Amino acid sequence: MNFETTIGLEVHVELKTKSKMFSPSPVTYGQEPNTQTNVIDWGFPGVLPSINRGAYQLGIMVGLALHADITRLTHFDRKNYFYPDNPKAYQITQSEKPLGTNGWVEIEVDGKKKKIGIAELHVEEDAGKNQHEDDGYSYVDLNRQGTPLVEIVSKPDITSPEEAYAYLETLRQIVQFTGASDVKMEEGSMRVDTNLSVRPIGQEHFGTKTEIKNLNSFVHVRDGLAFEEKRQQAVLLSGGEVRQETRRWDPDAKETLLMRVKEGADDYRYFPEPDLPPVAVSQKWIDDIQASLPQPPAERRQRYIEDWGIPAYDAGVLTQTKEMSDFFEATVAQGADAKQASNWLMGEVSGFLNAQHVELGQVALTPAHLAGMIKLIGDGTISSKMAKKVFKEIIQHDTDPDKWVHEKGLIQLSDPAKLTPIIDEILDNNQQSIDDFKAGKDRAIGFLVGQIMKQTHGQANPKVVNQILMAEIKQR
């Protein structure tokens, strides 16, 4: 029996604001517990929330970037449930009329493109965080309580773990490019809930779905879904029934484990939030936000390929983050060759960032200085070997590469009038190497070049050296 898989993803993205969704408390990651709160976050009686317009605007921005239809008149709802990290005993969200509907993203898996529909996206507040300590007590940190979120709910168009991975990666890039969120899973600013079901091919209704928790990376999402897909297929092939469950991914055991059985849908008793007014979104507001959106990553990739001849793979790497993409474009705008700029950013720059565990904005390197160094290589002022020394300087210090090269005497020696006497001296002292080369031993030329580079402290231009060397050997 063959099966088809249906996957639905709910992605919570933390919006990049200075204050919370319905209170003036600051939003700052990594602070001491319960220091970023006020009476609204704690749910004290009589306090009233107010809508963070900036957060709602970021939500619209995400919706437009995902090609969604923005709801012109909407309202917030109360989602009622009790949990220690939710002191109000309800969450303010959007249920009846979400911020946006009918969006889509285009993914690519194994060279094939596919559109994945987005059923809806809505703005809501985050809950706090429970902390279970070794002393046997559980503590509640409400710093996160009230942080603005946009929840993005996919349509059941995803049919494999690989498509789910591609969808999340594409979604992350699109949202990150808008600037609405930094979408860092390690800091909790992007979280994923998954639902998966399988059914025999040809069966019209969906199979019974299971939800998977504890998915802390895109790789965990892909691996967890792959395991659950096989587990459900095995249950059905053995004649059993798949139960509606919530399961937990164990990354060490590489399997999903049962957390609880769900016998029915949760009843959250939604009703309109009485303490907040409706939200009216004008067409001008939508148009202004649309005009402010940067070019999305897919369009940038295509432009790099068509305008600058960047290979498709390289263009994909350069558009992994907006920071890298903007830096690349700024470097080219400063006069650097696009392919060389791409090579340096993908090679030496990325290598340094990974080794130091820092981001591009945390180092001293500027587009102007990288472009300056690339131009020094291009015009022969420095060699590729010397460029690595220059690079180490300009990525760690705010140093002008041209000025530094001249101060340190690193200018490449390319003048034939200065190189010829040095080469002649080397040849005079190495007649055996000349004879070996003429006898067909090509490695002899490498020895001679090495001697010349040693004599010039590595500053001789290898291309010019080879030209003069061959000419001089011919005359002997």
From Swiss-Prot:
Pfam families from the UniProt entry: GatB_N, GatB_Yqey
Species this chain originates from: Lacticaseibacillus casei (strain BL23) (Lactobacillus casei)
Record-given protein name: Aspartyl/glutamyl-tRNA(Asn/Gln) amidotransferase subunit B
Reaction(s) the record says it catalyses: L-glutamyl-tRNA(Gln) + L-glutamine + ATP + H2O = L-glutaminyl-tRNA(Gln) + L-glutamate + ADP + phosphate + H(+); L-aspartyl-tRNA(Asn) + L-glutamine + ATP + H2O = L-asparaginyl-tRNA(Asn) + L-glutamate + ADP + phosphate + 2 H(+)
Biological role stated in the UniProt entry: Allows the formation of correctly charged Asn-tRNA(Asn) or Gln-tRNA(Gln) through the transamidation of misacylated Asp-tRNA(Asn) or Glu-tRNA(Gln) in organisms which lack either or both of asparaginyl-tRNA or glutaminyl-tRNA synthetases. The reaction takes place in the presence of glutamine and ATP through an activated phospho-Asp-tRNA(Asn) or phospho-Glu-tRNA(Gln).
Family listed: Belongs to the GatB/GatE family. GatB subfamily.
Subunit structure: Heterotrimer of A, B and C subunits.
PANTHER family found in the cross-reference section: GLUTAMYL-TRNA GLN AMIDOTRANSFERASE SUBUNIT B MITOCHONDRIAL AND PROKARYOTIC PET112-RELATED, GLUTAMYL-TRNA(GLN) AMIDOTRANSFERASE SUBUNIT B, MITOCHONDRIAL
Keyword Kinase: no
PROSITE patterns (alphabetical): GATB (PS01234)
Keyword Phosphoprotein: no
GO biological process assignments: glutaminyl-tRNAGln biosynthesis via transamidation; translation
